[in-house]
Swiss-Prot record:
The keyword Metal-binding does not apply. InterPro entries: Arg_repress, Arg_repress_C, Arg_repress_C_sf, Arg_repress_DNA-bd, WH-like_DNA-bd_sf, WH_DNA-bd_sf. Its main location: cytoplasm. Regulates arginine biosynthesis genes. One of its GO terms (molecular function) is DNA binding. The keyword Cell inner membrane does not apply. Pfam families: Arg_repressor (PF01316), Arg_repressor_C (PF02863). It comes from Shewanella woodyi (strain ATCC 51908 / MS32). It is found in: Cytoplasm. Belongs to the ArgR family. This is Arginine repressor.
Amino acid sequence: MQAAKTQDELVKTFKAILKEERFGSQSEIVIALQAEGYNNINQSKVSRMLSKFGAVRTRNAKQEMVYCLPAELGVPTAGSPLKNLVLDVDHNQAMIVVRTSPGAAQLIARLLDSIGKPEGILGTIAGDDTIFITPSNIQEIDKTLITVKSLFNFTN
């Protein structure tokens, strides 16, 4: 299980690095990932990841050729599995925040509102890709967080 978590963290870090749009070579990406603590990464692995996630080289705002990820895919459809639309679930001591694919927040929020108080959800506010969840009892926010994560098979 630890290996899977490490792989998930690597993917998240890899995507974050590419979003910076400042790495022009695979070796620069390797160095950046190694600086983040992924010592077993090499150019071959980076090459496979770039291919897997559809990364392309393009010009950034400074007109430098850099690797970047393609824009998010289109608006979710009714056939989109809901668990694939949830990108991140996090919380502080008062609120749970769910990040979704663009356009999916209201759909997910409606589902969460339908579950309601029995599962610890007082209410939601949804934008385009972010949902704020107010727990019905702040002392039980961890339990509500587990419920929300389990709904979408979210393991992080």
